[in-house]
Amino acid sequence: MPITSKYTDEQVETILTEIGAVLDKHGATPELSLMIAGNIATNVLNQQVAASQRKLIAEKFAQALISSLQEPKTH
């Protein structure tokens, strides 16, 4: 998502691979996977971010998510 990060690509990819394996193990559909990802984001914001900062961080997260989507190729 962000261009620069204090986390290494290896750290992110390792965690992503492990989470993906759990979703695969449970046969999670894309819809269920996205629902779980959304619930994780909501829980992190509600439990680990000051109430005064939640909306701003959620908006930045949403913008980063949208900007990371691949546009379909047109011919």
From Swiss-Prot:
UniProt family annotation: Belongs to the UPF0352 family.
The organism's taxonomic lineage, starting at the top: Bacteria, Pseudomonadati, Pseudomonadota, Gammaproteobacteria, Vibrionales
Pfam families: DUF1414
SUPFAM superfamilies cross-referenced by the UniProt entry: YejL-like
Protein name (database record): UPF0352 protein VV1_3121
InterPro entries: UPF0352 (IPR009857), YejL_sf (IPR023202)
Gene3D superfamilies from the UniProt entry: YejL-like
